[in-house]
């Protein structure tokens, strides 16, 4: 049995990369398969960097892939291991370990002192990460809310005006500023650029994803924001009308005043108006604002967990 780890070749390996990733992740019902068009949009984006992308071949046939990714816009001591993704029928033959070890070497060679890995919380994934020397540092919850009813009178700020903004350049710039001001104390924060924020809106349009942006205003000044929406590909995959609340932030001086509750209630109502029957959001258990408990009080329930693991490369 021979395992070869080779570099990803741009364009030539695109279809192969998508096929491996889609087949490897198909066991997760929340995963929406990627198309070649999706991958092309990803390649045009500000985060794409093929430097650390590798493909594994087992006895001459494609078996898996992984990405030793570095955020070029961040001044970080760590890089990221994305994957490894291995075809289901070829697992437990050393392919995933070979891909991971190659990624760790790649990041070390490129000057990184640590590496982060994130994965679905299940025994197989946890054991694999532990075998590579990783330790868990954060737990990320995916939480869902049935939209048969939207909570009201739960302490939301009555003085805040919740305004829906158009997806134009002014909104992109405002959202970018609010995101940076709201999340600067959070885990793995680094400043978001206007170009990155604009890219998210552009790709949503091109993929026919519905997005909406709500801003909370006090005395006409923006103090918080929420971005939500729905992806028709995800709806088709999961078999029901599910929408997401993708980002929620409140400026630090205005926290604990019910503004996040007001934004959440308006976001849930907006999803329901659009015909969604379920809402989903994500939260880090270590979130300094205590957001997990806020979501629980509003009726969100945890449906799955993702772990962030780390290890030194020195």
What is the meaning of each model-derived region?
Residues 1, 61, 72, 88-160, ...:
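Acyl-donor-binding surface of acyltransferase catalytic domains
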Residues 1-41, 55, 62, 155-192:
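Short amphipathic alpha-helix that is part of the acyltransferase structural core
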Residues 21-22, 28-58, 62-70, 190-218, ...:
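Active-site rim helix/loop that mediates acceptor-substrate recognition in acyltransferases
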Residues 61-65, 79, 220-225, 243:
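Glycine-rich phosphate/pyrophosphate-binding loop shared by adenosine-nucleotide-utilizing enzymes
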Residues 76-88, 238-252:
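Conserved acetyl-CoA binding element of GNAT-fold acetyltransferases
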Residues 81, 115-119, 245, 279-283:
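Conserved hydrophobic beta-strand within the GNAT/NAT acetyltransferase core sheet
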Residues 86, 92-105, 250, 256-269, ...:
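Conserved acetyl-CoA-binding loop-helix of GNAT-fold acetyltransferases
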Residues 132-152, 265-269, 273-314:
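Active-site/acyl-donor-binding loops of N-acyltransferases
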């Amino acid at each position: 049995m021979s395992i070869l780890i080779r570099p990803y070749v741009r364009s030539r390996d695109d279809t192969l990369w998508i096929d491996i990733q889609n087949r490897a992740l198909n066991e997760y019902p929340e995963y929406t398969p990627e198309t070649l068009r999706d991958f092309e949009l990803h390649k045009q984006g500000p985060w794409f960097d093929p430097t650390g992308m590798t493909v594994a071949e087992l006895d001459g046939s494609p078996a898996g892939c992984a990405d030793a990714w570095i955020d070029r816009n961040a001044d970080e001591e760590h890089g990221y291991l994305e994957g490894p993704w291995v075809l289901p029928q070829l697992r437990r033959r050393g392919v995933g370990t070979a891909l991971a070890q190659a990624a760790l070497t790649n990041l070390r060679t490129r000057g990184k002192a640590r590496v982060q890995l994130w994965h679905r919380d299940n025994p197989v994934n946890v054991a694999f990460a532990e075998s590579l020397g990783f330790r868990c540092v954060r737990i990320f919850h995916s939480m869902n809310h049935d939209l048969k009813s939207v909570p009201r009178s739960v302490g939301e700020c009555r003085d805040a005006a919740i305004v829906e903004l158009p997806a134009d350049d002014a909104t992109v710039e405002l959202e970018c500023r609010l995101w940076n001001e709201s999340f600067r104390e959070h885990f793995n924060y680094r400043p978001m650029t206007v170009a990155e924020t604009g890219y998210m809106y552009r790709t949503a349009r091109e993929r026919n994803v519905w997005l909406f942006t709500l801003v909370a205003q006090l005395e006409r000044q923006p103090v918080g924001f929420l971005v939500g929406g729905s992806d028709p590909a995800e709806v088709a995959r999961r078999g029901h009308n599910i929408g997401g609340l993708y980002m929620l932030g409140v400026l630090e001086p205005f926290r604990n005043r019910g503004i996040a509750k007001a934004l959440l209630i308006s976001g849930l109502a907006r999803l329901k108006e659009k015909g969604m029957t379920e809402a989903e959001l994500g939260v880090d258990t270590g979130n300094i604002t205590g957001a997990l408990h806020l979501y629980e009080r509003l009726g969100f329930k945890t449906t799955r967990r993702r772990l962030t693991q780390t290890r030194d490369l020195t």
